[in-house]
A protein has these predicted regions:
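Non-catalytic pre-domain segments flanking phosphatase-related domains
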Residues: 1-32, 57, 316-320
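Mg2+-dependent phosphoryl-transfer enzymes with acidic/Ser/Thr/Gly-rich catalytic loops
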Residues: 20-29, 45, 200, 215-320
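Short active-site oxyanion
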Residues: 59-63, 82-84, 181, 240-241, ...
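Short hydrophobic/aromatic-enriched beta-strand-loop microsegments
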Residues: 83-89, 149, 207-208, 261-265, ...
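Conserved acidic, metal-coordinating active-site core of Asp-based
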Residues: 119, 130-245
Length: 320
């Protein structure tokens, strides 16, 4: 049985308990989103790295499935011992974790890129283009972020991981047959949703997001689930053997199609509703908690920071 509907989408409590009857012995792979899921604001924690490496030693494959391009991956993630595959750009590429070699590619169709080029140059929104494993942004946007910051883009992250170019649309035309993903950023939700709906009506592409201020345009067959199916095929597994973790709409395909899905405590409502289980937040190392309690069957998989926070909260409640 895949899931117990009574536990599907249940809100995470201070110590979330899984009440279903899923057979966790069938899990042979863990698929992990990065931002808002595996990473905290300080990156990959020691405890998370140790837990993932322990899972690998136990014979469970660990696969990263992120919206980032390969060049934007933290070194700590690539250095997880035993990690074989990394899915990037929402499924556009699968790379060898040790060498960075691209093993699989499902980029946007050139016709889809042409349709995007008919629209975006007429709009004022910041655009990022993912191609060749790197992320590019217009130089004027890059310099403005460096000088003034932004209320709706992570200036520090963009400045660290993006390459500025003079003409972002010329780059898009030049690489129209190798575009992994196109990110568009918005200050206003009304504009974001209007552009989402506009692109969603067009053929040859998909639209998703990983933050409340962006949309991510990808290939019509590109998704984290499709890339995971490819990885499974290489390992002699199937998607029902996979436990997937995520927090945002670009994780939805793999959460729906994998054997067991885990939403983070900080996930969007639609992701929580789609999941079999809701763990604690990424800042509380919710990936660690879920793996240790569900897969390793430890009685208390709560990371020390989260446990201390809860004891403090209980003490404060007792004083009221």
């Amino acid at each position: 049985m895949k899931r117990d509907d009574k536990t599907r989408g249940a809100a995470a409590s201070s110590a979330p308990v899984y009440g279903g009857d899923f057979d966790f012995d069938t899990i042979r792979m863990i698929a992990l989103d990065l931002d808002g899921t595996t990473l905290t604001r300080n990156g990959l924690t020691r405890r998370t790295k140790e837990t993932l490496e322990e899972a690998i030693r136990r014979g469970i494959h660990v696969v990263i499935a992120t919206g980032r391009v390969y060049a934007s991956l933290p070194e700590a993630v690539k250095n997880i011992q035993g990690l074989q595959y990394i899915i990037t750009s929402n499924g556009a590429h699968i790379s060898d974790a040790a060498t960075g070699e691209i093993l699989y590619s499902d980029c946007m169709e050139p016709e889809a890129v042409d349709l995007v080029l008919e629209i975006l140059p007429q709009e004022p929104y910041p655009v990022e283009v993912f191609t060749g494993g790197k992320a590019y942004i217009a130089r004027n946007i890059y310099e403005d972020l460096a000088q003034n910051g932004s209320d709706f883009m992570s200036a520090k992250y963009v400045l660290r991981t993006r390459t500025p170019v003079d003409d972002i649309y010329a780059l898009m035309r030049e690489h129209r047959d190798a575009i992994e993903n196109i990110n568009v950023h918005f200050a206003a939700q009304e504009a974001r949703m209007a552009m989402w709906e506009r692109f969603a009506k067009l053929p040859h592409m998909t639209v998703t997001s990983s933050t409340h201020h962006n949309i991510e345009i990808g290939g019509v067959t590109t998704s984290k689930a499709a890339a995971l199916a490819e990885v499974c095929g290489r390992l002699g597994l199937e998607l029902p053997h996979v436990m997937a973790f995520g927090d945002s709409p670009n994780d939805l395909t793999m959460l729906r199609e994998c054997g067991f899905s885990v939403a983070m405590g900080n996930a969007t409502p639609d992701i929580k509703a789609a999941a079999d289980y809701v763990t604690i937040t990424n800042e509380e190392e919710g990936v660690v908690y879920a793996i240790r309690t569900l897969l390793f069957r430890e009685k208390d998989g709560v990371p020390p920071r989260a446990s201390l926070r809860r004891r403090l909260a209980a003490w404060m409640r007792g004083r009221r």
